[in-house]
Amino acid sequence: MAIQHPDIQPAVNHSVQVAIAGAGPVGLMMANYLGQMGIDVLVVEKLDKLIDYPRAIGIDDEALRTMQSVGLVDNVLPHTTPWHAMRFLTPKGRCFADIQPMTDEFGWPRRNAFIQPQVDAVMLEGLSRFPNVRCLFSRELEAFSQQDDEVTLHLKTEEGQRETVKAQWLVACDGGASFVRRTLNVPFEGKTAPNQWIVVDIANDPLSTPHIYLCCDPVRPYVSAALPHAVRRFEFMVMPGETEEQLREPQNMRKLLSKVLPNPDNVELIRQRVYTHNARLAQRFRIDRVLLAGDAAHIMPVWQGQGYNSGMRDAFNLAWKLALVIQGKARDALLDTYQQERRDHAKAMIDLSVTAGNVLAPPKRWQGTLRDGVSWLLNYLPPVKRYFLEMRFKPMPQYYGGALVREGEAKHSPVGKMFIQPKVTLENGDVTLLDNAIGANFAVIGWGCNPLWGMSDEQIQQWRALGTRFIQVVPEVQIHTAQDNHDGVLRVGDTQGRLRSWFAQHNASLVVMRPDRFVAATAIPQTLGNTLNKLASVMTLTRPDADVSVEKVA
């Protein structure tokens, strides 16, 4: 697909395997993951530096697991507040929905507050670990074109200098107003909310109460959120007829803050910004050699804090697949599973976020009265209360098709869901999270059994060529039993008993886990070989000895 571009003579040429448009969180995560896989990456960003004002304020357990996968979670955690509850309040201050899940099945707290600019800075600094990754700021993407085996990008610097980039693949992480998506004429379906919200960030938190509160005031709904490093965020609905300029005026800002603070004059304002809440979804996530990710593919209201986290899911899902294709270990048909797996869940998160917004600010006042009464009654039903407390309403990603092999009834199958991440004990006595023992790899994890037993020599060669780790899980008391050791198999102890419970619940003794920690297949030793053949087929894996030419950019 060719796209018209100016007749320009580039002064600088770049040749890479992957070009990423946009140095936001999704682009930076993609670059970190591909960087550690040895892929040549160039990130191009229109701005002259990272955005330094707070935007997203919620990071979940899945996103922290993604940070862990690229070795950055220890640097991210100091900028988070774990176990961050969300409470919906009536106009009189009564809590009618309390969301504070205390589960950590993926290894991290489910809800966390965070400061996005500081976490983005951690990811940018993380790129310095990889000589094969570069990030260029002050580069405006003016045009691009696709050929059979590459994408050509035309850039312009602040000084007007022209540059060209030739890449095998382009990942568009250039935001909700994505130039790439618009240029490709990909429909961005959905709607824009009629109401805007003004966000006010304050240093030296004048309240210092923990958690986040959503006050469902019919006169002017507002949000009060405690953030790390003593930052307080308030969000107020902008009412019809009000403008950002008016609300920024000192007397009007004082009036807003007097609603939530006893002394609105004694505050240290960081900044105020007006946001519009959109709920939109790209019709396609892959267009030949261009892939859309993050806000370029979907945008949603902020009320469940899932815009940022959905972008992290995109990056984790796409990066390992793109690396396999570039390395010649899979055909590019594998990239079609990115949209197949991610689009439906992104739609579910959009719908959840819209619903949460309607709970906070119902379109009709009578709906708010009904909400308050019904919620008061439901809170006296323990199952309903647990449903909110444990955040069970959040649609957990589950893939029904794509890079996986499903056996049996889909409703009860763990295939297509994220695998748990408990602590395990290594043979040297160290206790660590499961992913740390696996690295950024596939894993075949067996309960009590040698995971290689049911595999042919050819299969072992094929999966080892992918970097697969073969894990035998045993009760912790058996970890030092030398007679159970097998060459090429890592033995770990089930420190918390969670792996035993998981395998018992799902009636399987072997799991094939993808690099993004999703269950690709389950089996028992006698069926593993057949299951791996099916999985290799649906993932379009190549044979290690096959004559596969890895694409190179001229």
Swiss-Prot record:
Per the UniProt entry, the Enzyme Commission number(s) are 1.14.13.127
Which class of enzymes does this protein belong to?
oxidoreductase
Annotated GO molecular function terms are: 3-(3-hydroxyphenyl)propionate hydroxylase activity; FAD binding
Q: What reaction does this catalyse?
A: 3-(3-hydroxyphenyl)propanoate + NADH + O2 + H(+) = 3-(2,3-dihydroxyphenyl)propanoate + NAD(+) + H2O; (2E)-3-(3-hydroxyphenyl)prop-2-enoate + NADH + O2 + H(+) = (2E)-3-(2,3-dihydroxyphenyl)prop-2-enoate + NAD(+) + H2O
The record's disulfide annotation reads none
Binding-site residues, FAD: 17-46, 285-295
Question: Which cofactors are named for this entry?
Answer: FAD
What pathway does this protein act in?
Answer: Aromatic compound metabolism; 3-phenylpropanoate degradation
Biological processes annotated in GO: 3-(3-hydroxy)phenylpropionate catabolic process; 3-phenylpropionate catabolic process
Q: Which UniProt keywords apply?
A: Aromatic hydrocarbons catabolism, FAD, Flavoprotein, NAD, Oxidoreductase
Q: Which domain of life is it from?
A: Bacteria
What NCBIfam families does the entry give?
PRK06183.1-1, PRK06183.1-3, PRK06183.1-5
What is its biological role? Catalyzes the insertion of one atom of molecular oxygen into position 2 of the phenyl ring of 3-(3-hydroxyphenyl)propionate (3-HPP) and hydroxycinnamic acid (3HCI).
Q: Which PANTHER family match?
A: 3-(3-HYDROXY-PHENYL)PROPIONATE/3-HYDROXYCINNAMIC ACID HYDROXYLASE (PTHR43476), FAD-BINDING MONOOXYGENASE (PTHR43476:SF3)
What family does the entry list? Belongs to the PheA/TfdB FAD monooxygenase family.
Name of the protein: 3-(3-hydroxy-phenyl)propionate/3-hydroxycinnamic acid hydroxylase
Native source organism of the sequence: Escherichia coli O7:K1 (strain IAI39 / ExPEC)
